[in-house]
Amino acid sequence: MHTKTLTELKAGLAAGDFSSRELTEHFLARIKQYDGELNSFVTVTEEQALAQADAADATLATNRASSSVSGLLTGLPIAHKDIFCTEGVRTSCGSKMLDNFIAPYTATVVEKMAAEGAVMLGKTNMDEFAMGSSNETSYYGPVKNPWDLERVPGGSSGGAAACLGARLAPAATGTDTGGSIRQPAALNNITGLKPTYGRVSRWGMIAFASSLDQAGPMAQSAEDCALMLQAMAGHDHRDSTSLNEKVGDYLGALKDDIRGLTIGIPEEFFPDTLDGAIADNSRDAIRELEKLGAKVVSVSLPSIKLSVPAYYVIAPAEASANLSRFDGVRFGHRCDDPQDLEDLYKRSRSEGFGDEVKRRILVGAYALSAGYYDAYYRRAQQVRSLIRDDFARAFEKVDVLMGPTAPETAFKLGAKKDDPVSMYMADVFTIGVNLAGLPALSMPTGFINGLPTGTQIIGNYFREGQILNVAHKYQQATDWHKQAPAFGGAQ
């Protein structure tokens, strides 16, 4: 059953080929057998999952008897990134700071998917507070890449991507602040979508950088991501950044024709320094879409080269404010025997946060400090406006933009741990999308020495249906997304 896509599993449940309990037990058994080596889960919610599966089976049986329509995700097992609050279940955000935090409420994303009948398998490992590109900053240890256990799965949604790559779950939720859905999707040979900023509610999602964070689906195929987004998307009055925009018919959009669609190729996404094999895989994907009737033109995003430095001012600045609430007073790790309030703050935060989180808090506080605000934070926001304008000009000429998702394949565990700048460059092609608030998807487009590569499709605001359709058409013509690693008998 684990070789089937989410969409295929949905059809099997509807037809009565197997029950949700059988399906859920199958994935729980795989997690139990293989995740000790992979470390992709922080918490497995076995009892809750089986109870939800039994309830789903009852719903499916009733609906089959009455020819009624079940929820979009009824009976389908899904893993949630451990950044989404889940009532009564630990929500750690990959940090010692929240190691014992039991959320008193459930995030909107989890709530909406549960309302559509989804079964929660558990909570996936992640870089601490979503700060990282390799899933090595987690308090619970690094996640391994199922294609090579000596390599990283990418981050920060590395646990979600790795468990999907190894077929320990058919689908998962992730979050993307600078590439945290798309980069690990590329490194694990899965499909991942970052929606338009505000398309999916952030309520109950622990904040890293509030103007950049966005939740999205991760799965084997674009069709699966469309199914998940249909359940996740929508306005939420509890989230002030949620946009009251009509939810599209994402599954219906997969039937649209792409003949005449114009694909823009930003020259900045194919620099001379890029690994030639990665460039070739993405160019091959673009050529495949040309065969299907799409047109290709060259475009330029001149300010995109400034995206990484701008991001690493804006995101840490927002993080320094968001993480100030974790002080050991109301919740979070509290040090033993504090001498006074100042000692409580200092030691609780020093003990609770890891090195990368501390680094970003310091950088962010510095950028916002008197005398440096104009030199760094204000200037970074001006660069952000330039990047947004570059994308707007490009979309006057084209429908979508395409290029490699990541500049390299999965690197060795520990290879960049002492070189933060090198680690930050892992998101060089993805960060600009977050700064502009655009939707983008990563899809599998080949291998280099047995390691997956991905190609990114960027769309205009609220054009998720279009980029999902482009990816779906490509996946109908190719089988890269069907390739699975030898690990855990995923093939």
Curated annotation (Swiss-Prot):
It is an enzyme of class 6 (ligase). It holds the Pfam family Amidase. It catalyses: L-glutamyl-tRNA(Gln) + L-glutamine + ATP + H2O = L-glutaminyl-tRNA(Gln) + L-glutamate + ADP + phosphate + H(+). One of its GO terms (cellular component) is glutamyl-tRNA(Gln) amidotransferase complex. The active site is at 81 (charge relay system), 156 (charge relay system), 180 (acyl-ester intermediate). One of its GO terms (biological process) is translation. Its EC number is 6.3.5.7. It comes from the Bacteria. One of its GO terms (molecular function) is ATP binding. The keyword Cytoplasm does not apply. Keywords: ATP-binding, Ligase, Nucleotide-binding, Protein biosynthesis. Allows the formation of correctly charged Gln-tRNA(Gln) through the transamidation of misacylated Glu-tRNA(Gln) in organisms which lack glutaminyl-tRNA synthetase. The reaction takes place in the presence of glutamine and ATP through an activated gamma-phospho-Glu-tRNA(Gln). Belongs to the amidase family. GatA subfamily. Heterotrimer of A, B and C subunits. This is Glutamyl-tRNA(Gln) amidotransferase subunit A. It comes from Alcanivorax borkumensis (strain ATCC 700651 / DSM 11573 / NCIMB 13689 / SK2). The lineage of its organism: Bacteria, Pseudomonadati, Pseudomonadota, Gammaproteobacteria, Oceanospirillales.
